Design a protein with these regions (language model features):
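Bacterial N-terminal signal peptides that target proteins for export
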Residues: 2-12
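C-terminal motif of bacterial Sec signal peptides marking the signal peptidase cleavage site
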Residues: 20-24
Length: 177
């Protein structure tokens, strides 16, 4: 049975909450030997480049991750790859969903949040993918909000959802249903 994007996002958020001590990462777009990219006006916010080769196999994602200082978590399985680093400040879940079990969703959870960090990440995503992310929801007390946008990544339409809250930020990249 095919899961809707909301069901997959909910499942990913629950996994991230359970795995908050694990982290993962992706590329090195600024070629400085680290996968984090300084963003924001102070350059102190670090955006992580995950592998976004949708449809690819677990072995491809493992190869992509092998060039960096991230460890594959023992709780990884045929549906999910989890990586960790020493800082445990970021969690990345690579999810392989569907019959072919190719990469279908990537979730990046940052253990710290705040408006300036969220706005830095939003600006970085908009710049990278040439999109404008729209604010779609806000909590009653104004401490939690969601931005979303649709981008073309590797020739595929990808939905990007960024959930921002006081304690952290979740960025989800998923193929639409």
């Amino acid at each position: 049975m095919k899961k809707s994007i909301k069901e997959r996002v909910t499942m990913l958020a629950m996994m991230a909450a359970m795995c908050v001590t694990f982290t993962a990462c992706g590329g090195d777009s600024d070629d400085d030997g680290t996968p984090q990219v300084p963003t924001g006006p102070t350059g102190s916010t670090e955006y992580v480049d995950p592998c976004l080769d949708f449809g690819s196999s677990q072995s491809h994602v493992k190869e992509y991750m092998s060039g960096f200082n991230w460890e594959l978590n023992e709780n990884s399985n045929e549906y999910t790859l989890l990586y960790s680093n020493a800082g445990a400040s970021v969690v990345i879940n690579y999810m392989f969903i569907g019959n072919g079990k190719g990469l279908g969703m990537v979730g990046v959870t940052y253990a710290s949040g705040g408006d300036s960090k969220a706005l830095g990440f939003k600006a970085e995503i908009e710049k990278r993918y040439g999109i404008t992310m729209k604010k779609v929801t806000n909590s009653e007390d104004g401490t939690e909000y969601i931005y979303e946008g649709l981008a073309t990544i590797g020739g595929k339409q990808v939905e990007i959802i960024m959930n921002c809250y006081k304690q952290g930020i979740n960025i989800i990249y998923a193929l639409p249903d």
